[in-house]
């Protein structure tokens, strides 16, 4: 398993004044207040916000909705375009 999103760029870390100029997308997701957020059986991890957990028979659509929620909130609140580092398999688009 691995993280859902790539780390942010150094330029974005500077622009957002992240602590110690961290490029951690987990930090960004936590600051957006999304740690622990659930959709269906999918949940953003309480331990590391750049992971999505299957807590109760999550569907691929649940995971995709969470990913899109994070991307939407990052764009709306921070003018940040997050990029996934996962690969999509199947008959759906990444958003």
Where does each model-flagged region fall?
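Conserved ATP-binding N-box helix of the HATPase_c
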Residues: 74
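Phosphate/pyrophosphate-binding loops and the adjoining catalytic core of nucleotide-dependent enzymes
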Residues: 70
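Phosphate/pyrophosphate- and phosphate-bearing ligand-binding catalytic cores of soluble enzymes
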Residues: 1-63, 77-95
